């Protein structure tokens, strides 16, 4: 048994994830019943990540703030600027792509609308939800994975603990290290979890449902790849003043792949924390920016909102001028930042964006239904972009990366 564990550790996580991915595709395709059964492994893995993430963020942020010294370097502001700027550029990219490759949504009037969740009535509701999350009960925040509330309480308690005795602060630091060890243990099961997730997805959905929306998916994924491989590297290069691609590919490989299959930025927080520690980044910074990024850094969501909204407008023959498209980009940026506070995420913010072009709500909800049909790919790619960008921008703002030789 020990020899098997040693071999597992020696091979490395990324090669094992690739093996799990290939096996999952084959099992889901060739043996659907087995694939569905293996879905339990994926559910357990995602459940473990989601369970450990809130307490990890709370303890890690509290420990980092309580141990923070006046001369320590914290770089939260530049990361926040990159988050918002990157999300806006993603929204603009989606607009340009939608104008360059106009897409019609097939069967828009024949698809049953999604009615089990109510979309927000406007930006005010989105922002109100976001702000109310800040003042949530701390126990409730941890129990429901409300990361805005968790961050707020962790910061407040961390600041209060600065005046605590050295012994108390050491205990908090030791607790933080213990939670980090638990996270490393959970992440070690990523290949098995991804095998289960992929096998179950292929077994239940197959490939046929995606084929009819091939053009729409191509534009969505193409925009996300453009942001990940062109726009983000430019932003990073401007900050670290050297070739950004080694860092970009590291983040995509070690964060993006896991996020693609878990389809949860919150579940991927422990993975990002682990990567940030491996890169040698300042804990005072990444313990705050990574959970914050999982809440407000939503470039993928902005792309999804704009592409589907403009596709609906094109299908219905609604004219969209440059000013309206620019306004849509601003609205999508603000709405995307609040996507984590909306049940259903980016898809249920589409009616909000559609309202800018007077598209009826029943039609907008049919667009949401199309989003759920392609969600296997759309949501996976969106989460991979969002989560890998969290750790990428955090690293780009850290002087450690600037000081490393290319």
UniProtKB/Swiss-Prot annotation:
Subcellular location: Cell inner membrane
Segments traversing the membrane: 11-31, 45-65, 79-99, 141-161, 185-205, 216-236, 298-318, 330-350, 357-377
Name of the featured protein: Serine/threonine transporter SstT
Family annotation (HAMAP family): Ser_Thr_transp_SstT
Function: Involved in the import of serine and threonine into the cell, with the concomitant import of sodium (symport system).
Membrane topology field: Multi-pass membrane protein
Family (UniProt): Belongs to the dicarboxylate/amino acid:cation symporter (DAACS) (TC 2.A.23) family.
Keyword line: Amino-acid transport, Cell inner membrane, Cell membrane, Membrane, Symport, Transmembrane, Transmembrane helix, Transport
NCBIfam families assigned to the protein according to its UniProt record, in alphabetical order: PRK13628.1
Any GO BP: threonine transport
Principal subcellular localization: membrane
Protein's organism: Psychrobacter sp. (strain PRwf-1)
A Pfam family: SDF
GO molecular function, one term: neutral L-amino acid:sodium symporter activity
Catalytic activity: L-serine(in) + Na(+)(in) = L-serine(out) + Na(+)(out); L-threonine(in) + Na(+)(in) = L-threonine(out) + Na(+)(out)
Gene Ontology CC annotation, any one: plasma membrane
């Amino acid at each position: 048994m020990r020899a098997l564990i040693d071999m597992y550790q020696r091979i490395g996580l990324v090669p094992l994830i690739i093996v799990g991915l290939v096996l999952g595709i084959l099992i889901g395709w060739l043996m659907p019943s087995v694939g569905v059964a293996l879905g339990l492994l994926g559910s357990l893995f995602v459940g473990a990540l989601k369970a450990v993430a809130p307490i990890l963020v709370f303890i890690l942020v509290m420990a980092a703030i309580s141990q923070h010294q006046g001369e320590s370097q914290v770089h939260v502001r530049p990361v926040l600027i990159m988050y918002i700027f990157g999300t806006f550029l993603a929204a603009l990219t989606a607009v340009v792509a939608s104008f360059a490759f106009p897409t019609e949504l097939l069967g828009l009037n024949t698809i049953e609308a999604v009615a089990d969740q109510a979309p927000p009535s406007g930006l005010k509701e989105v922002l109100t939800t976001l702000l109310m999350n800040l003042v949530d009960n701390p126990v409730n925040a941890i129990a429901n994975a409300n990361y805005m509330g968790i961050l707020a309480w962790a910061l407040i308690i961390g600041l209060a603990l600065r005046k605590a005795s050295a012994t108390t602060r050491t205990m908090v630091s030791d607790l933080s290290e213990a939670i980090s060890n638990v996270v490393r243990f959970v992440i070690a099961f990523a290949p098995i979890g991804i095998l289960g997730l992929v096998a179950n997805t292929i077994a239940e959905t197959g490939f046929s449902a995606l084929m009819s929306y091939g053009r729409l998916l191509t534009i969505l994924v193409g925009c996300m790849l453009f942001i990940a491989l062109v726009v983000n590297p430019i932003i990073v290069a401007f900050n670290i003043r050297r070739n950004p691609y080694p860092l970009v590919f590291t983040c995509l490989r070690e964060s993006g792949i896991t996020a693609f299959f878990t389809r949860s930025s919150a579940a991927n927080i422990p993975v990002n924390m682990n990567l940030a520690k491996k890169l040698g980044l300042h804990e005072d910074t990444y313990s705050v920016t990574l959970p914050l990024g999982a809440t407000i850094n939503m470039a993928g969501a902005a792309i999804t909102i704009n592409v589907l909204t403009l596709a609906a407008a094109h299908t219905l023959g609604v004219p969209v001028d440059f000013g309206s498209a620019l306004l849509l980009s601003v609205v999508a940026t603000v709405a995307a930042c609040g996507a984590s506070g909306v049940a259903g995420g980016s898809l249920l913010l589409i009616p909000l964006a559609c309202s800018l072009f007077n598209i009826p709500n029943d039609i907008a909800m049919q667009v949401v239904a199309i989003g759920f049909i392609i969600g296997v790919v759309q949501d996976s790619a969106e989460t991979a972009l969002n989560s890998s960008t969290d750790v990428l921008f955090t690293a780009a703002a850290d002087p450690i990366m600037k000081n490393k030789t290319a």
